[in-house]
Amino acid sequence: MQTKHNQIVARIEQFGPGKAFSAKDFLDIASRTMIDVTLASLAQSGKIRRVRRGLYDMPKINPALGGELSPDIDEAARAIARRQRWKIVPEGAWAANLLGLSTQVPAKIIYLTDGPNNEVPIGRRSIHFKHARPKAMAGLEGKFALVVQALRHIGKEGIGPSEIEKLRSSLSPAEKRRLVKDARFGVDWIYEVAKKIAEKTA
């Protein structure tokens, strides 16, 4: 039978490189005190990286240079949201970048949230959590939320065949079907785009 320490290590290895996490992701395994001690020990030994207070990751390695890559901002945001029990949705330009619809990383990385306004430094960047009314967050979940935010940012006239194909390749068949289902109750043009994205799905 695995020790609590080994169970925590096993879960981190299961997360894989790039995944951000906090003590809250292990509360089903051990006490908070033991988790904190274990994570601090792993960080000190170099097995994981301390991104900021209470937030860690197993860094990805640059295959060409061999050094550690910067923390994944989206992973960090999601780990913070899990810890705080917030619902978050990437806003506009950042959503478009995450989906590959834009190569430009926005100067300000914003997530809509049902939590409070907050700014969290991560490396050389900052994550801005922007409180949104419940009505604005209603129905926005998973990939659907990401796609809708990106489409709203780009606009109807900015969506062409190449954008459709990029979105099509980034979604699983199940996600495409869910996108069409959820988009039915939203803006008409977004629903039409959703149908085009899913039309080749079996």
Regions found by a protein language model. Give the residues of each.
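Short beta-edge/loop segments at beta->alpha junctions of small alpha/beta modules
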Residues: 2-79
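Short coil/turn segments at secondary-structure boundaries
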Residues: 22-23, 108-110, 163
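Positively charged, aromatic-accented nucleic-acid-binding surfaces
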Residues: 29, 79-80, 91-94, 153-159
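Amphipathic alpha-helical interface surfaces
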Residues: 35, 91-92, 143
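Short gly/ser-rich loop at a beta-strand->alpha-helix junction or flexible surface loop bordering the NTP-binding
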Residues: 51-54, 84-123
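Short, isolated positions in well-ordered beta-strands
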Residues: 127-129
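Hydrophobic alpha-helical interaction segments
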Residues: 131-202
